[in-house]
């Protein structure tokens, strides 16, 4: 919708160089899975698979705003808008290049690992993982926004818990939005919940959601893992334009997505050689074919779409599940709207995540 953070348009005042870093995709698990080092092109897909044996999770699963998101890309944009408990992606430990005020190009090693003295040595040692555990330092710097859960509970504060270009969470690579060249970041991981449950909430009164939000944030012992609002119009758009990606994830699994993107790139490069074929041919082809697939959304979701204008997808974990069940059952006895427990977590997550893909 906005062009994203990549170069967009033709009105720049200088030449532009675009570097695809997706093949620099190494991920190093350190401190028994409690932290990771993600290189420029490493993805959340790859990280999720690496952390599973440790019983840990990355900051985001799949990606809060797009399928196939990179770790570094999310950090550079302070991503994680739907994450209530974890907040925005943030770290004070990274390896990056910048232009100084004097116009000099320098490499800054703030990642907390002794990798050498000159840029070539530092980058080579990191990419090839030529460092030992005693070279990893643990400075008094954050590798996540570990105070966000306190800010988000302050529902009467004059400022929002988070917003674009929040100076509290702009630090080197974090929130840099492409103004520096990030080679690697160091991030905390999170203990995977034993149980998770998605609550699908519907109402025709926006104020109902305001009451729910304030109650959950200020009164619940356990914060939601995530929460995402959908208007009925957004629901319809996601249903139509995200159907192709959903079908792939549902039938082939999320691990197939990187292969799908690689195949799509090859198709688009081939299509560019034929003037009769449209730009982004693979996207248009997939969406066209998806029209022949049966409705992929559960009937109960469709019923809520027809009945309610406002929709809210809330994911709770562990003790928060029972807490939310009791709250919603009591709340809707005297308030307009209703809720149900979703048994189709993937489809619900896709409907609000995929809307940002295009």
Place the predicted regions along the sequence by residue.
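Noncatalytic alpha-helical scaffold of FAD-dependent oxidoreductases
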Residues: 1-358
């Amino acid at each position: 919708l906005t062009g994203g953070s990549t170069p967009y348009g033709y009105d720049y005042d200088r030449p532009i160089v675009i570097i695809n870093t997706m093949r620099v995709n190494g991920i190093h698990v350190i401190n028994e899975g409690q932290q990771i080092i993600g290189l420029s092109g490493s993805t959340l897909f790859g990280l999720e698979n690496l952390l599973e044996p440790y019983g840990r999770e990355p900051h985001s699963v799949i990606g809060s705003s797009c399928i196939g998101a990179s770790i570094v890309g999310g950090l550079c944009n302070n991503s994680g808008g739907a994450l209530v408990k974890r907040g925005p992606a943030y770290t004070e430990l990274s390896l990056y290049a910048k232009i100084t005020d004097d116009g000099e190009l320098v490499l800054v090693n703030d990642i907390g690992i002794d990798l050498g003295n000159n840029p070539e040595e530092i980058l080579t040692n990191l990419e090839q993982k030529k460092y030992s555990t005693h070279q990893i330092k643990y400075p008094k710097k954050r590798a996540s926004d570990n105070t966000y859960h306190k800010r988000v509970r302050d529902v009467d504060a004059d400022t929002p818990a988070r917003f674009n270009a929040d100076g509290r969470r702009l630090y080197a690579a974090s929130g840099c939005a492409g103004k520096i060249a990030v080679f690697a970041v160091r991030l905390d991981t999170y203990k995977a919940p034993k149980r998770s449950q998605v609550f699908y909430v519907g109402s025709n009164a926006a104020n109902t959601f305001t009451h729910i939000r304030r109650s959950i944030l200020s009164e619940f012992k356990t914060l939601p893992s995530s929460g995402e609002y959908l208007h009925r119009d957004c629901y319809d758009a996601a249903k139509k334009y995200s159907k192709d990606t959903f079908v792939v994830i549902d039938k082939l699994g999320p691990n197939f997505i990187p292969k799908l993107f690689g195949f799509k790139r090859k198709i688009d490069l081939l299509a560019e050689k034929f003037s009769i074929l449209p730009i982004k041919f693979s996207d248009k082809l997939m969406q066209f074919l998806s029209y022949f697939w049966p409705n992929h959304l559960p009937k109960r979701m469709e019923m809520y779409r027809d009945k309610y204008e406002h929709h809210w997808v809330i994911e709770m974990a562990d003790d928060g599940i029972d807490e939310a069940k009791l709250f919603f059952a009591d709340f809707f006895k005297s308030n307009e709207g209703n809720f149900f427990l979703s048994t189709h977590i993937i489809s619900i997550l896709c409907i609000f995540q995929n809307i940002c893909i295009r």
